[in-house]
From Swiss-Prot:
Descriptive protein name: Endonuclease 8-like 2
Annotated active site: P2 (schiff-base intermediate with dna), E3 (proton donor), K50 (proton donor), R306 (proton donor)
Name of the gene: NEIL2
FPG-type zinc finger locations on the chain: 280-316
GO cellular component: nucleus
SUPFAM superfamilies reported in the protein's UniProt record: S13-like H2TH domain
Amino acids binding DNA: N227
Sequence ranges of Basic and acidic residues compositional bias: 73-89
Organism of this sequence: Bos taurus (Bovine)
Length: 329
């Protein structure tokens, strides 16, 4: 799945089409009928963690009518969600990881109403969640780089193609799309690429007793962080992926957060400059020091297991009886 920097790049590609009308559609999507986008206007584009949100509206007269018909329960629900997320972002002490409102691990805290088709006149946002090789192409289609398992050189088929009034088009590949009938309500405090990323909230989450590699992938606290960033940040901080966060001193946790933010920002900058991000441990057989790298699938019991690379020498595992003050810095 594309991580935060990649989805930010997709958002950058889509932004020039905001304000244009869809004049032609295509694609293989079965869940969403591509023709349902015909004549809609792309009015806004937002990115939150690993998800992209696109707002589509009919003409202004229809939008005005739809907003006036929006039910009061829906409006009240949106206001409550916005108020709660604002409180969490401004006052981390009000946030409770064990409360009933907690979002399951792996969710990035988005609160929306969903469905397969847009309600007439209601505010409609298309939520785009990308698969492992998900992407967006502008004014071009993806071409096969190698033969498939059957030996065919077939080009990938886009899920959705939108041609706009400005003569350009967008092609969406390997993604899931769902209509949302209210604005995405999120807390930028959890977005690792946001200027409002809340380090204190992140450090509190990392200090748990569970293996630190589990916490890093929890989108409630590190929205946009994926497997590549996880592996690279842990290696650069010299932390074993299975080390419980509670055994790590604050300086090491702060260093880990620094590496998460720095690596993510460098990756994003490279995306815009067209350069490939350099990795030191991800998918490597040896670390930069020449040590043999271990690869293993790690994840919470009953949860999703992710391939993890680490160097046993550069990232020694901590024992429960090791005093924090004696841990390597």
């Amino acid at each position: 799945m594309p991580e935060g920097p990649s989805v930010r790049k997709f958002h950058h590609l889509v932004s020039p089409f905001v304000g244009q009308q869809v004049v032609k559609t295509g694609g293989s999507s079965k869940k969403l009928n591509p023709t349902s986008f015909q004549s809609l206007w792309l009015q806004d584009s937002q990115v939150h963690g690993k998800k992209l949100f696109l707002r589509f509206d009919p003409d202004e007269e229809a939008v005005s009518l739809g907003n006036s018909l929006l039910s009061e329960p829906l409006r009240e629900g949106e206001q409550k969600d916005k108020a709660r997320h604002h409180q969490e972002a401004s006052d981390p002490s009000s946030w409770s990881p064990g409360g009933d409102s907690a979002v399951p691990s792996g969710d990035d805290g988005l609160q929306c109403l969903g469905g397969d088709t847009p309600a007439g006149g209601a505010e409609r946002w298309l939520q785009v969640s990308f698969g492992l090789f998900g992407s967006i192409r502008v004014n071009e289609f993806s071409r096969a780089k190698k033969a498939n398992k059957r030996g065919d050189w077939r080009d990938p088929v886009p899920r959705l193609v939108l041609h706009f009034s400005g003569s350009g088009f967008l092609a969406f590949y390997n993604c899931q799309m769902t209509w949302r009938f209210s604005s995405p309500v999120v807390s930028p405090a959890s977005d690792i690429l946001s200027e409002k990323f809340h380090r204190g909230q992140a450090l509190e989450a990392l200090g748990r007793e569970q293996p630190i590699c589990y916490t890093l992938l929890d989108q409630r606290y590190f929205s946009g962080l994926g497997n590549i960033i996880k592996n690279e940040a842990l290696f650069r901080a010299g932390i074993h992926p299975l080390s419980p966060g509670s055994l790590l001193g604050l300086p090491r946790l702060e260093a880990l957060v620094d590496h998460v933010v720095a690596f993510s920002a460098d990756w994003l900058q490279g995306k815009f400059q067209g350069t490939r991000q350099h990795t030191q441990i991800y998918q490597k057989e040896q670390c930069p020091a020449g040590h043999q790298v271990v690869r293993e699938s790690l994840g919470p019991p009953g949860g999703f297991q992710r391939l993890t690379w680490w160097c046993p020498q550069c990232q020694p595992r901590l024992s429960a009886d090791e005093p924090k003050q004696l841990q390597p810095s």
